[in-house]
């Protein structure tokens, strides 16, 4: 089993493998999974810093594993104008739900109440599965830990 304790934002070498994870799994500090080529991997990271799509895990044996996002069930609310978009972002933000924000679209986990709210503001809802990469929040860090590592050896 590969063991990864280090995360990097980039490397100047070759990527050895990839791991595809959904948003809820990327939020965990301890992950037991399988790489995309079928190798078992254990990931042990600092709590409170979700893995970001594109980050690279460095294993104890020196392999580099890139993190990919897995498409999952989401609701994407699409606005025709900036005023409707601004209003729905305000109201969804007041509900403290995780949101991914793009140009005149906002994505969240499926929730019929939130979907109806968005429709009431004139937005259309697209339920095509997509990679979910929500904002880190007002007090969150960017999520990028450049080269952070620590030893687990005694």
From Swiss-Prot:
Keywords: Chaperone, Cytoplasm, Nickel. GO terms for cellular component: cytoplasm. This is Urease accessory protein UreE. Pfam families: UreE_C (PF05194), UreE_N (PF02814). Gene3D superfamilies: Urease metallochaperone UreE, N-terminal domain, UreE, C-terminal domain. It comes from Alteromonas mediterranea (strain DSM 17117 / CIP 110805 / LMG 28347 / Deep ecotype). GO terms for biological process: protein folding; protein-containing complex assembly; urea metabolic process. Residues 143-154 have a biased composition (Basic residues). Transmembrane segments: none annotated. HAMAP family: UreE.
